[in-house]
C-alpha cells in the first residue's frame, strides 16, 4: 500500500478518519492554510491598542454561511483518459451525479472530490462511466467541520463556483477566457473586460476564506471578495523577441492560450520546430506534437523558444508479488517531483503584465488606469456585484442551494483607530503643520558643523556637457538657500566606457573634506557601473538621469535639483528631519531579501540603527545563506559589529532590539519563527553576556506589503495612521493592519504587521513586560516618516525600506559569483538612498 502523505494523516489528529491512501498529487496542498499554526508569542496577553480616534470602516470581507454536516467524504479520483482538463472532469462528474442520482452536494479540485454524503458502497472504491470515460473513486478520509481540511474543501467549492460562472483558471486565479471577445462579455454584472493598444485586461473575482474574531472575541470565518485583473499582451514572444533585449524578457510571465497555463521565462533559445525530442517512448518534432495534441500548426520554422523550469510529478510503477511469489498487477506508487525544462515555441507564448518600458508609458497607463486603479467607491461594489452575478447564473445558484451557501451582499463593517499625528522636526521647527503625512512645502535645514567641508565633483556621461549647466546652477543655488558650506568641484565628461576612470579621478582628488560624486547617467548599465564602484571603493555617489539633468522645464528641474541636494547630504550622514520617538535604549533592525529573476540569485540585506533618532544605519548585504550554519554565522557577525558600534557611541548596549522583517510569505511564517527567530535569540544572548549586560527584550515583526485586504472610510481611503487590530485579524496571530501613506489615486492598501516574538526583559528593577500594542503601533507609524527620499510617509517602516533598497541595488548591480562586499568607509552611510 502507498504511504499516506503527512497532511492527510493529520486528519486523524483533528478527529477525522483516514480510510484510504493517497499520493502527493492528490494530497492536501500546503500552499494556503486557513487554520494557521499558533504563532502568537507566549508572553502576549493583550493584542489590541486603544489610543487614537475611533473610526468606523468597511472592508472587502463579508459574512457567509455554508452547509453543516457531521462529516464529509474526500475521494481520490483517477480518470481512464489522460490529459483531461479540470473543467472537463468537473462536467463529467456533474453528468455522473445526475445520471446516478448521487446524494448530497459535492465539489472537485481536479483530483480530490469532496461530498457531503457517501458515494461508495461497502467497498471504499467505486467506478463510474459516461461517454467512453471512466472515473475511479477511492475513499481517502472523512473530514470533520472546522478543521483545516474542511476549510480547504470550502475553498474548492468557491473555485467550482467560478467555473460554473464561466471563468477559466489562469495561474492562481479565475478570469475571463483569454480568447473571449467583447461581445461575449457578460452584461451589467460579472467581471470587467477592457481592450486597448494590443493589451487585453481579463477580469475576474478573487475569493478566499479567512478566520477572524467577532467584537465579542468569538471566532468567525470571513469571505474575502475582490475584483482582480490579468493583463495580457496580444504580442507573442516571437514578435517581441530581439537578441539585444533578451534580458528584458527573462523573468517575465507568459501564458499559453492553448491550455491557459502560465509560466515564467527562464531562458530563450533559438530553435527549429522540426527538432526532435523523446516523449512516452516516441521521437517526434515540436511541430508534430502541437499538431497531434492541440491541433495547432506552427507557422515559422526557426523561432525563439521559451525555456521554463517546472516541477513535474512522476508516477512510478512497481510490480507486487503475492504470498506465493507470483507477480500481480502493477500498482502505482506515490508520485515524485522531478525538475524539468519545457521548451515552448515563442509564437504560442503571450506576455503577461508590463515591461519596464510599458510601465513608464504614461499614455498606456492612463488608458488602463480606469480598470487597474479603481477608486474606493468602485471597490465597495465588488461584493454586491459578485452576489448578483451568482444570482444570474442557474448553474451557480444550483450549486449554492445544494451547499446551502449564503453570502452577505454588503461589505463587513469594522472598527479602526486613527493614531495621533507625528511631529516632523527640521532645524528645530515643525515642518508638517499643514498636513501630518506630507511636508513637501516645509523648509528643510541640515545641522552641519561650520568647520566641516564638503566637495561635490561632477561626472557627466555625455559629451554635450553644456546641457547640464542649468541643473548645476540650480544645485548651487539650493546649497546657498540651505546655507551649506559645500562647493562644486571638477566637472568631468566621458563616455559610458570611461565612467570608472572619471570616478577614480574624483576619488583621488581633494583632501580634508567629505567627498561626493554627482553623476549624470544615461541608462541602467552606467548606473550599475557607478553603484558597483561605490560599494567597492567607498566613494559616495548621487546619480541623476540624463533626462532630469537636461530638463528645460524650470519648475520640474528645480524640484529634482532640490531633492538631489537633500539626498547628497543625507548620504553624507546628516538628517534632513527627525521624528521624536521616546524609547529606552533601542536598536531597530530592518531585513529583506531580493530575488533576481534573471540570475536566479538571492541577496539578503540587513540594516541596524546606530543612533537614538533611528535615522542612521549600519548596513550589511550577503548572498542569501544556503543553510542553518551559514545563516547563524552571518547573522551573528552582523549583530556583533552593529552592537559594538552602538556601544562605542553610548557606552551601553540597547535594552531592546526591534526587528522588522520583510520578504516572508504566508507559508514561511512557521519556518521563519523556528529558523530565524530561534537562531537570533541565543546569538544576541551570547553577545550580551560576553559584554556583561543583561539580555535585551527582542521583538520580531513580519512586514507584509502584498495583502488583499482593503479598508474604506465612508467610501474613501482611510487617513494615514489608521490602524485595525480587531475582527479581520487572525485569532492565533498577534497582528495589525496599518495605513501609513496617503493615496490620492486608486485605493490604499494597508500593510500587515505580524509579531512572531516579543520577550520579557529582566532588569535590576524587575521584569519589563512585552511591548504594549499601543507603543508598537506608534513606533511603527513614526518610522514611516523617516525616509529621506520622500517628504512624506511611506508604506513601511524605514529600516525595512532601506533593507529593500539595499538588497535590490546589490541584486541588480552585483555581477559574478564573488561574495558581495560593502566598503567599510560607507557601511554607516545611506549610500543606497
UniProtKB/Swiss-Prot annotation:
It comes from the Eukaryota. Residues 227-353 form the PAZ domain. InterPro entries: PAZ_dom (IPR003100), PAZ_dom_sf (IPR036085), Piwi (IPR003165), RNaseH-like_sf (IPR012337), RNaseH_sf (IPR036397). GO terms for biological process: regulatory ncRNA-mediated gene silencing. Residues 313-338 are annotated as: Disordered. PROSITE patterns: PAZ, PIWI. GO terms for molecular function: RNA binding. Required for the production of functional progeny from adult somatic stem cells (neoblasts). This is Piwi-like protein 2. It comes from Schmidtea mediterranea (Freshwater planarian flatworm).
Amino acid at each position: 500500500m502507498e504511504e499516506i502523505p503527512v497532511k492527510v494523516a493529520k486528519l486523524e489528529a483533528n478527529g477525522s478518519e483516514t480510510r484510504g491512501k493517497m499520493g502527493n498529487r492528490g494530497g492536501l496542498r500546503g500552499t494556503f492554510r486557513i487554520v494557521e499554526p499558533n504563532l502568537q508569542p507566549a508572553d502576549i496577553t493583550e493584542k489590541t491598542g486603544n489610543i487614537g480616534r475611533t473610526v468606523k470602516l468597511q472592508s472587502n470581507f463579508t459574512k457567509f454561511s455554508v452547509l453543516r454536516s457531521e462529516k464529509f467524504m474526500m475521494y481520490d479520483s483517477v480518470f481512464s483518459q489522460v490529459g483531461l482538463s479540470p473543467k472537463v472532469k468537473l462536467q463529467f462528474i456533474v453528468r455522473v451525479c445526475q445520471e446516478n442520482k448521487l446524494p448530497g452536494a459535492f465539489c472537485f479540485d481536479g483530483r480530490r472530490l469532496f461530498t457531503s454524503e457517501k458515494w461508495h458502497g461497502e467497498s471504499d472504491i467505486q467506478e463510474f462511466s459516461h461517454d467512453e470515460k471512466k472515473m475511479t473513486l477511492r475513499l481517502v478520509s472523512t473530514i470533520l467541520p472546522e478543521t483545516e481540511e474542511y476549510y480547504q474543501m470550502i475553498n474548492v467549492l468557491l473555485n467550482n463556483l467560478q467555473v460554473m460562472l464561466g471563468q477559466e483558471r489562469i495561474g492562481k486565479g479565475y478570469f475571463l477566457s483569454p480568447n473571449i471577445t467583447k461581445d461575449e462579455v457578460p452584461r451589467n454584472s460579472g467581471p470587467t473586460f477592457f481592450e486597448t493598444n494590443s493589451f487585453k485586461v481579463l477580469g475576474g473575482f478573487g475569493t478566499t476564506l479567512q478566520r477572524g474574531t467577532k467584537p465579542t472575541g468569538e471566532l468567525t470565518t470571513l469571505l474575502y471578495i475582490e475584483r482582480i485583473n490579468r493583463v495580457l499582451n496580444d504580442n507573442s514572444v516571437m514578435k517581441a523577441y530581439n537578441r539585444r533585449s533578451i534580458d528584458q524578457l527573462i523573468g517575465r510571465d507568459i501564458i499559453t492560450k492553448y491550455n491557459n497555463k502560465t509560466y515564467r521565462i527562464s531562458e530563450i533559445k533559438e530553435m527549429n520546430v522540426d527538432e526532435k525530442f523523446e516523449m512516452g517512448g516516441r521521437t517526434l518534432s515540436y511541430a508534430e506534437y502541437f499538431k497531434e495534441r492541440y491541433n495547432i500548426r506552427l507557422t515559422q520554422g526557426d523561432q525563439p523558444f521559451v525555456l521554463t523550469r517546472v516541477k513535474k510529478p512522476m508516477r512510478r510503477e512497481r510490480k507486487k508479488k503475492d504470498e506465493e511469489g507470483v507477480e500481480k498487477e502493477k500498482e502505482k506508487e506515490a508520485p515524485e517531483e522531478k525538475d524539468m525544462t519545457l521548451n515552448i515555441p515563442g509564437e504560442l507564448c503571450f506576455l503577461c503584465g508590463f515591461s519596464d518600458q510599458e510601465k513608464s508609458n504614461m499614455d498606456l497607463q492612463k488608458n488602463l488606469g480606469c480598470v487597474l486603479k479603481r477608486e474606493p467607491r468602485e471597490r465597495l461594489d465588488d461584493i454586491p456585484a459578485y452576489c448578483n452575478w451568482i444570482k444570474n447564473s442557474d448553474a451557480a445558484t444550483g450549486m449554492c442551494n445544494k451547499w446551502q451557501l449564503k453570502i452577505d451582499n454588503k461589505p463587513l463593517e469594522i472598527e479602526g483607530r486613527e493614531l495621533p499625528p507625528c511631529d516632523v522636526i527640521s532645524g528645530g521647527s515643525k515642518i508638517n503643520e499643514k498636513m501630518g503625512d506630507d511636508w513637501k512645502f516645509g523648509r528643510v535645514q541640515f545641522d552641519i558643523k561650520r568647520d566641516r567641508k564638503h566637495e561635490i565633483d561632477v561626472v557627466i556621461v555625455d559629451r554635450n556637457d553644456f546641457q547640464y549647466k542649468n541643473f548645476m546652477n540650480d544645485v548651487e543655488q539650493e546649497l546657498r538657500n540651505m546655507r551649506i558650506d559645500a562647493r562644486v568641484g571638477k566637472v568631468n565628461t566621458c563616455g559610458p566606457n570611461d565612467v570608472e576612470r572619471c570616478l577614480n579621478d574624483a576619488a583621488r582628488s581633494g583632501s580634508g573634506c567629505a567627498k561626493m560624486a554627482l553623476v549624470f547617467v544615461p541608462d541602467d548599465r552606467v548606473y550599475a557601473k557607478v553603484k558597483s564602484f561605490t560599494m567597492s571603493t567607498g566613494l559616495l555617489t548621487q546619480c541623476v538621469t540624463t533626462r532630469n539633468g537636461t530638463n528645460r522645464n524650470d519648475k520640474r528641474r528645480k524640484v529634482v535639483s532640490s531633492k538631489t541636494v537633500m539626498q547628497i547630504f543625507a548620504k553624507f550622514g546628516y538628517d534632513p528631519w527627525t521624528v521624536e520617538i521616546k524609547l529606552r535604549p533601542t536598536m531597530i533592525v530592518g531585513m529583506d531579501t531580493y530575488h533576481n529573476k534573471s540570475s536566479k540569485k538571492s541577496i539578503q540585506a540587513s540594516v541596524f540603527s546606530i543612533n537614538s533618532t533611528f535615522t542612521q544605519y549600519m548596513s550589511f548585504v550577503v548572498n542569501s545563506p544556503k543553510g542553518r550554519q551559514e545563516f547563524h554565522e552571518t547573522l551573528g557577525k552582523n549583530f556583533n559589529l552593529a552592537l559594538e558600534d552602538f556601544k562605542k557611541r553610548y557606552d551601553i548596549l540597547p535594552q531592546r532590539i526591534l526587528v522588522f522583517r520583510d520578504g516572508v510569505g504566508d507559508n514561511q511564517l512557521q519556518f521563519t519563527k523556528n529558523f530565524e527567530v530561534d537562531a537570533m535569540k541565543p546569538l544576541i544572548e551570547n553577545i550580551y553576556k560576553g559584554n556583561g549586560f543583561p539580555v535585551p527584550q527582542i521583538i520580531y515583526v513580519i512586514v507584509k506589503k502584498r495583502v488583499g485586504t482593503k479598508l474604506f472610510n465612508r467610501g474613501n481611503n482611510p487617513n494615514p495612521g489608521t490602524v485595525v487590530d480587531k475582527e479581520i485579524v487572525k485569532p492565533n496571530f498577534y497582528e495589525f493592519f496599518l495605513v501609513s501613506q496617503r493615496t490620492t489615486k486608486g485605493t490604499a492598501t494597508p500593510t500587515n504587521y505580524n509579531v512572531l516574538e516579543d520577550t520579557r526583559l529582566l532588569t535590576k528593577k524587575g521584569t519589563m513586560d512585552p511591548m504594549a500594542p499601543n507603543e508598537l503601533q506608534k513606533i511603527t507609524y513614526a518610522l514611516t516618516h523617516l525616509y529621506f527620499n520622500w517628504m512624506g510617509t511611506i508604506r513601511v517602516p524605514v529600516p525595512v525600506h532601506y533593507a529593500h533598497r539595499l538588497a535590490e541595488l546589490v541584486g541588480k548591480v552585483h555581477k559574478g559569483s564573488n561574495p558581495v562586499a560593502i566598503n567599510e568607509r560607507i557601511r554607516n552611510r545611506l549610500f543606497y538612498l
